């Protein structure tokens, strides 16, 4: 693998790219129109590697994961550079790493660090009723501190409460459905696609229109979870597994250790909001550091500084014992950082094609927008996917509805796009960043999570239930 990567890198460095380069700079639309569908093969290879290698060669995968990511990334970048020119390839590489990946991974890192310094302690026994309450609390938090923030805050208390359980994979799966995805649909803070809508003129509290849809889906999923978890709970009891219940005099009341870190989490949430508000309120913040035509805005730089400062101060002001009680390690964030840089790079052609040809799909009905946005958000980054169909809907010439910066979008169409992007991120481990984080943390704590395809079996089985009441 290393020799192959060395050869690919040498070819990229010494090949006469300028001879093959396309004349002049191509716009994203021109690139998307020109790119063939087979240019998405490295992206498909990346997804299949994530799905298959952990099943057939787990130890090899853990050791060589970075090399696999580098292989698929170069397999896209080299032909792309040869055909369209090294300058264009480098520009898109910088755009996806500096413009998208950097803020993405910094946000995850910050929330991961701060949440790891908060520990819910006390006697809390995991059973179906308690688990439903914990999932509901996390779901309601998701829209106000983000799906990633809520996931990182709630994952360890739920794992700790159910430590005695033997059958608990369903808890983690529904955790991803509810807290890591569906719960984030009520505000722009909840999930990045809605923040993108807010930046394009949709009112901050408009997403509250999704409350009835969210409540119905949450009710369906919590009912289904309660039935599944009750069955698993009874089997655990029948097999002789019981929670340790201490005498009344020895019980510890529920309390938060490291509670001051909630302030740092709120600072991170404020940083995300500011990154969306500042450029539209004060245009100077949309300017910034420019490299190869790609600008990292001052608003994004402020966001990054606030997040990293919060993470640093969180560690400096929190005792190590609290992290130890959470079994805190860096493995989960390291895995997400490695895999998602490959996903971001290899999905460049897929997003370019979607941006160029999305308007040609003939979408007019809300149900069409819901399903196409949702299906693509399951595998692509749901933020640009949302933006593509948001723009497509805005270009259809509607004369009434939700007013955006450029035009009107009917309320039910915007609801369909929003629900598709947010809800369907639950369909795969890569549909939304918290999904993979939850999976990694669960496995660190001894919970054997489903494989990539095994998880999809869970999600698609439930998909028929939680999408049936969505906008049409």
Model regions: which residues?
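Transmembrane helical segments that form the transport core of multi-pass membrane transport proteins
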Residues: 267-388, 392
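Hydrophobic mid-bilayer segments of alpha-helices in multi-pass membrane transport proteins
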Residues: 39-50, 64-81, 101-110, 136, ...
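Membrane-core helix-loop-helix motifs of multi-pass transport proteins
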Residues: 165-231, 237-262, 437-465
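N-terminal secretory/membrane targeting signals
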Residues: 1-22
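Conserved small/polar residues in nucleotide/adenosyl-binding loops
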Residues: 466-471
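Transmembrane alpha-helix boundary signature
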Residues: 79-96, 112-126, 144-152, 350-356
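Membrane-interfacial helix-loop connectors
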Residues: 79-81, 142, 152-167, 171-173, ...
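Interfacial loop-to-helix junctions that mark the boundaries of transmembrane helices
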Residues: 27-38, 60-67, 91-102, 204-212, ...
């Amino acid at each position: 693998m290393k020799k192959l990567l060395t050869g690919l890198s040498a070819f990229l460095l010494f090949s006469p790219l300028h001879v093959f380069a396309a004349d002049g700079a191509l716009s994203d639309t021109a690139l998307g129109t020109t790119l063939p569908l087979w240019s998405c093969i490295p992206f498909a290879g990346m997804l299949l590697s994530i799905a298959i290698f952990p099943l057939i060669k787990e130890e090899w995968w853990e050791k060589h994961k970075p090399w696999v990511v580098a292989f698929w990334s170069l397999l896209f970048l080299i032909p792309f550079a040869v055909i369209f020119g090294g300058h264009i390839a480098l520009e898109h590489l910088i755009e996806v790493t500096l413009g998208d990946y950097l803020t993405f991974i910094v946000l995850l890192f910050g929330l991961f660090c701060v949440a790891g310094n908060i520990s819910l302690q006390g006697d809390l026994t995991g059973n179906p009723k308690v688990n439903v309450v914990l999932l509901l609390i996390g779901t309601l938090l998701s829209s106000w501190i983000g799906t990633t923030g809520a996931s990182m805050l709630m994952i360890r208390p739920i794992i700790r409460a159910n430590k005695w359980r033997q059958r608990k994979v369903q808890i983690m799966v529904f955790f991803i459905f509810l807290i890591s995805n569906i719960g984030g649909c009520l505000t722009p803070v909840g999930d990045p696609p809605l923040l993108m809508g807010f930046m394009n003129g949709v009112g901050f509290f408009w997403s509250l229109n999704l409350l009835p849809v969210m409540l119905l889906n949450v009710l369906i999923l919590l009912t289904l979870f309660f039935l599944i978890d009750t069955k698993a709970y009874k089997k655990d009891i029948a097999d002789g597994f019981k929670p340790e219940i201490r005498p009344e005099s020895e019980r510890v009341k529920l309390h938060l250790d490291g509670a001051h870190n909630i302030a740092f989490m709120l600072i991170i949430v404020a940083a995300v909001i500011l990154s969306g508000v500042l450029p539209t309120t004060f245009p100077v913040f949309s300017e910034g550091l420019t490299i190869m035509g790609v600008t990292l805005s001052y608003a994004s730089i402020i966001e990054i500084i606030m997040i990293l400062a919060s993470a640093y101060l969180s560690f400096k002001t929190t005792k190590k014992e609290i992290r130890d009680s959470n079994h805190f390690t860096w493995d989960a964030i390291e895995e997400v950082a490695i895999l998602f840089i490959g996903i971001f790079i290899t999905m460049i052609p897929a997003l370019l094609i979607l941006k160029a040809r999305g308007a040609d799909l003939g979408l007019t009905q809300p149900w069409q927008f819901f399903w196409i946005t949702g299906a693509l958000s399951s595998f692509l980054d749901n933020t640009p996917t949302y933006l593509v169909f948001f723009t497509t809907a805005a270009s259809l010439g509607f004369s009434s509805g939700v007013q955006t910066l450029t035009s009107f979008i009917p309320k039910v169409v915007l609801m369909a796009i929003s629900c598709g992007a947010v809800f369907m991120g639950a369909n795969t481990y890569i549909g939304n960043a918290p999904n993979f984080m939850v999976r990694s943390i669960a496995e660190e704590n001894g919970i054997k999570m489903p494989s990539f395809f095994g998880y999809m079996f869970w999600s698609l089985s439930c998909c028929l239930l939680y999408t049936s009441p969505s906008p049409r």
